[in-house]
Regions:
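Extended, low-polarity transmembrane helix blocks
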Residues: 1-35, 53-61, 65, 72-147
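Membrane-interface interhelical connector segments
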Residues: 34-51
Length: 147
C-alpha cells in the first residue's frame, strides 16, 4: 500500500508544480511563526476562527512539513492532502465574505493564489512527485536525469 502511495509517473514537468506548491506552503508556514499577528493567530482571530493561537501553530506546522515534503518529492501525495484541506478552508473562510460584499470578480482576483495552490495540490495528489522525486527512488523506479 505504501509503495502505491509513493508510485509516480515519469513526468519531467511535475517538478515545476512541486517546487511552486512546496515553496509557497513552506514560506507561508514560516511566516505564521515569524509574523503571528498578521499571518498566524492574529489573522485567524480577525476572521473569527476558534482557538486562533492553537490553529495558527497547527496550520503553520502542517504548511512547513508539507512544503518540505513536497519540495523533496517525498510522500508527495500524502503531503498534498493537508495543503488541499488548508486551501479549501482558506477559500471558504476568507473569500466568501469578499464574494458577498464585493462580487465574483473581486473574489476571483483576491483568491487567485489560493486557487493555484488548490489546483496544484490536487494535481500532486493525482500524479505524485514525478520523475525527479524521492518517491520515485524509494519505489525502485528508475530515474535518469536526461531530458
Amino acid at each position: 500500500m505504501i509503495k502505491q502511495l509513493l508510485q509516480t509517473d515519469d513526468s519531467k514537468t511535475t517538478i515545476i508544480i512541486r517546487l511552486m506548491v512546496g515553496a509557497v506552503f513552506l514560506s507561508e508556514g514560516i511566516q505564521k511563526f515569524l509574523l503571528p499577528t498578521i499571518r498566524g493567530a492574529g489573522r485567524f482571530e480577525k476572521i473569527g476562527l476558534p482557538n486562533p493561537e492553537f490553529l495558527g501553530s497547527f496550520v503553520g506546522a502542517f504548511e512547513i512539513i508539507s512544503g518540505i515534503l513536497i519540495l523533496l518529492g517525498l510522500a508527495t501525495r500524502l503531503a498534498a492532502i493537508p495543503t488541499l484541506i488548508i486551501m479549501l478552508v482558506a477559500i471558504a473562510t476568507t473569500k466568501s465574505e469578499v464574494l458577498q460584499n464585493e462580487g465574483f470578480w473581486s473574489m476571483m482576483h483576491g483568491s487567485r493564489t489560493d486557487w493555484s495552490m488548490l489546483l496544484g495540490s490536487i494535481y500532486l495528489i493525482i500524479r505524485g512527485g514525478g520523475k525527479w522525486s524521492l518517491d520515485r527512488n524509494l519505489t525502485g523506479q528508475r530515474t535518469t536525469f536526461g531530458v
